[in-house]
Amino acid sequence: MTFLFIVITLLALIFGAILGFASIKLKVEADPVVEKIDAILPQSQCGQCGYPGCKPYAEAICNGDEITKCIPGGQTTIVKIAEILGVDVPTMEGIEEPIEKVAFIDENMCIGCTKCIQACPVDAIIGTNKAMHTIIPDLCTGCELCVAPCPTDCILMIPVKKNIDNWDWKFDAKLVIPVMNVDGSEKKLVVGE
């Protein structure tokens, strides 16, 4: 029994040393500029830039693609990327400011299929199989990736109207989103406390 323990321990040490050596010898060096740009991007993996995630978009930027495609990152991200690359910040003339939207699930039509939950890159949708789902407005980036997979078309994208109360002041403030119920009554959803 002791002999078996010693043999297994020696094998574990030998294989551990081989793996440690291989990880150092076969290490692939990443482009540090790509890593810096990827760290600045919002990591929502929403695909609004035309790439499947933030890392591929960072690589495309280093290969000469436009730096203005990240909608969730906004102007601040564009300025930071321009600083890293040492280029001028492109003018935003002719480029419309995207309308900020939040997904809303009509809970009377939701069948609980969980397809929207699987599609959401930021886990802004909560619910379980065969039960109603709902959206957490603070987490929703408005990427619309949850709309297409929904078989009952119960997900609507509602524009968030900017006013003095819900504008992004960069400090803890309440976000009020007007929500129209199915019965026609209107209520206000307060988030961000």
UniProtKB/Swiss-Prot annotation:
Q: Where is this region: Hydrophobic?
A: 1-23
Q: Can you tell me which residues bind [4Fe-4S] cluster 1? A: C46, C49, C54, C70
Q: Record-annotated residues binding [4Fe-4S] cluster 3?
A: C120, C140, C143, C146
Kindly indicate whether the keyword Iron-sulfur belongs to this entry. Answer: yes
Q: Which Gene3D superfamilies match?
A: 3.30.70.20, Electron transport complex subunit B, putative Fe-S cluster
- Class in the EC hierarchy, top level: translocase
Annotated membrane-spanning segments are none
The function of this protein is: Part of a membrane-bound complex that couples electron transfer with translocation of ions across the membrane.
Instruction: Supply the name of the protein.
Output: Ion-translocating oxidoreductase complex subunit B
Q: Which organism is it from?
A: Haemophilus influenzae (strain ATCC 51907 / DSM 11121 / KW20 / Rd)
**In the record, what lineage is assigned to the organism producing the protein?**
Bacteria, Pseudomonadati, Pseudomonadota, Gammaproteobacteria, Pasteurellales
Q: Identify the coding gene.
A: rnfB
